[in-house]
Design a protein with these regions (language model features):
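Short, surface-exposed patches at the edges or C-terminal ends of soluble domains, predominantly
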Residues: 18-317
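Sec-dependent signal peptide recognition
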Residues: 2-7
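Hydrophobic h-region of N-terminal signal peptides that target proteins for export
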Residues: 8-18
Length: 317
């Protein structure tokens, strides 16, 4: 029975992944934009590291939302250097991959080497410490392998797997589907990301959609905290689960966190769909900010970016 359940999970998850398209009709209200149109900080979305999500692809709704809030959003295919980073106030890296694990390769199996060179990681760290803001978004395996070295540079350790919740009865495999982080259930920590600039921007609930877990170092502030039942399934190939797939206990680990690094700021999140709006599978089911259960995700994203850019009116801004 467990073998059948694992096979079904593989079929459903891998099918949805292959058919994700941006929901260009997603336009939630922004009654109080942080900046005048086209006058806000420069947000550069990485597209130069075989990224599964880019500003003109699956992260198009992400880019569109920030533009409506006044940010100047562009994509970039340049390697990370001191010169290339001069064009950014906020650098967004979403689901970067090494060439061997690119979407085009069709190979989401181990090994999963770094998507970034040592020189690029050093350049990003220096840029942040000088005042830049990094938004690092790392989905399930193989993405944590690709981003692991960059994460370590900022004090976090990723599990190269799929974060899920154990079945209380033990009769079913862990659930790697949507996960709720709320103030009420204790998984969403309060802070600028939840409070926003006013009561109208307050967030009580955030939904994630199949991501990774990471261990926060001592200088890292948890935002989304995984519960006691959390485990990380670490298969040798993405979505290829079985009864023998290793399970790493990750209770108390994070799926979202922030930190200060020198003069700069960093937000690290272990799930990507939560920050975009997609239509998944043959039925074009909403997944992400457009999902009915994720109504506050878009405001959570805006609050995070307001914190990164030190927008006027933000707590600790």
């Amino acid at each position: 029975m467990k073998n059948t359940l694992f096979a079904l999970a593989l079929l459903v998850a891998s099918s949805a992944r292959a058919q994700q398209v941006p929901d260009t009709g997603f336009k939630p209200p922004i009654p109080n934009p942080a900046y005048a149109s086209g006058r806000g900080p420069r947000v550069v979305v990485d597209g130069g590291h075989h990224n599964f999500h880019t500003a003109d692809g699956r992260y198009l709704p992400f880019a569109a939302l920030l533009r409506r809030d006044g940010y100047r959003v562009s994509g970039s295919t340049s390697p990370f250097t001191a010169d290339s980073l001069k064009s950014a106030d906020i650098l967004v890296i979403a689901n970067a991959l090494a060439a061997v694990n690119s979407e085009a390769s069709g190979n989401w199996a181990l090994p999963t080497p770094s998507a970034f060179s040592a020189d690029e990681i050093a350049a990003v760290k220096r840029w942040v410490e000088a005042g830049g803001a990094l938004f690092l978004i790392v989905d399930h395996m193989p993405m944590p392998g690709a981003a692991g070295d960059l994460g370590r540079a900022f004090g976090v350790e990723f599990s190269n797997g799929f974060a899920g919740l154990k079945d209380p009865t033990g009769a079913r495999p862990p659930n790697i589907g949507p996960m709720a982080f709320t103030v009420a259930n204790g998984r969403l920590e309060k802070g600028p990301w939840s409070e926003g600039r006013s009561a109208a921007e307050r967030v009580e609930s955030v939904i994630t959609f199949t991501g990774s877990a990471f261990y926060p170092g001592p200088k890292v502030t948890p935002v989304l905290r995984l519960p006691e039942a959390a485990v990380s399934l670490t298969p040798s190939a993405a979505f290829e689960f079985g009864p023998e797939t290793p399970r790493v206990p990750v209770a108390g680990w994070c799926q979202g966190a922030v930190l200060e690094a020198g003069k700069g700021r960093v937000a690290i999140f272990g799930e990507a769909a939560m920050f975009t709006a997609q239509l998944a599978g043959p039925q074009k089911s909403p997944m992400g900010m457009n999902a009915p259960e994720a109504k506050q995700n878009f405001q959570f994203l805006l609050n995070l970016v307001h914190w990164l850019s030190r927008a006027a009116g933000m707590p600790n801004g």
